[in-house]
Amino acid sequence: MSSEQLQDPVEPDKILSAVTQRGLRLESILTTHHHLDHAGGNLDLVTKCRKQGLEGLKVYGGDDRIGGLTDTVSHGYKXRLVATSTFIAWLHHRHTTGHICYLVTEENSTKEGAVFTGDTLFLGGCGRFFEGTAEQMFKALIEVLSKLPTTTKVYCGHEYTVKNLEFGLTVEPKNEALKHRLEAVKRLRASNQASVPGTIGEELATNPLMRVSEPDVLAHAKTTDPIKAMKTIREEKDRF
């Protein structure tokens, strides 16, 4: 029986049904932050697993407000998920304090890794600054996530990509890569397919919040400071 981990499992019944159908065994939950649309299913899932005789389900997270938390992780925490996979946790105090992104990689493999970003990085955008600042978001997006290999898969917490890319064109109306990506994502959504995952490379080419050092983005924000540009552009997105 294969062992698997979950990311922000908010619908326990659907998850358990899928796990049973596939003959899997749950070992861990990676929780990005405490908001109920991400962590709201943790306690129910842990309880139902126990009723099925599954003890020892680990719940990772960086905030004691997370339901069912068993293992608190901090920035740079590294752990093994299953026999061949590990994860590294990055703490980002900007959407909420204690928000964690998880980079999952396979050992001794040439496959691209996957980063689970919750509400820090969306495809084409980023989360609101509920408990954090533009400086903290800059560190998360530019100093950490943008340094990942461009082929790294990005799994974010919400399907906001069309709206984000439409907003992006108000910032960079001449960005051809952005125009092409928006049309491609619209086709996916029209056929009821998800836009997630994306890649770090796509974000670097089309996400204005990851392009705050680009001349056109700085000019749009009327500043030469990338952090001020990030603050201005996120505030514009709030009103979009």
Curated annotation (Swiss-Prot):
Name of protein: Probable hydroxyacylglutathione hydrolase
Residues binding substrate: R128, H158, E159, Y160, R234, E235, E236, K237
Protein's pathway: Secondary metabolite metabolism; methylglyoxal degradation; (R)-lactate from methylglyoxal: step 2/2
PANTHER family assigned to the protein according to its UniProt record, in alphabetical order: BETA LACTAMASE DOMAIN, TENZING NORGAY, ISOFORM C
Binding site for Zn(2+) 2: D37, H38, D119, H158
An example Gene Ontology biological process: methylglyoxal catabolic process to D-lactate via S-lactoyl-glutathione
Role this protein plays: Thiolesterase that catalyzes the hydrolysis of S-D-lactoyl-glutathione to form glutathione and D-lactic acid.
Keywords: Hydrolase, Metal-binding, Zinc
UniProt cross-references to CDD domains, sorted A to Z: hydroxyacylglutathione_hydrolase_MBL-fold
Binding site for Zn(2+) 1: H33, H35, H95, D119
Transport among keywords: no
Keyword Metal-binding attached: yes
Top-level taxonomy: Eukaryota, Metazoa, Spiralia, Lophotrochozoa, Platyhelminthes
GO MF: hydroxyacylglutathione hydrolase activity; metal ion binding
Entry note: cofactor: Binds 2 Zn(2+) ions per subunit.
Enzyme Commission number(s) of this protein: 3.1.2.6
Family (UniProt): Belongs to the metallo-beta-lactamase superfamily. Glyoxalase II family.
InterPro entries to which the protein is assigned, alphabetical: Clx_II_MBL, HAGH_C, Hydroxyacylglutathione_Hdrlase, Metallo-B-lactamas, RibonucZ/Hydroxyglut_hydro
Recorded superkingdom: Eukaryota
Catalytic reactions of this protein: an S-(2-hydroxyacyl)glutathione + H2O = a 2-hydroxy carboxylate + glutathione + H(+)
Cofactor(s) demanded: Zn(2+)
Organism of provenance: Schistosoma mansoni
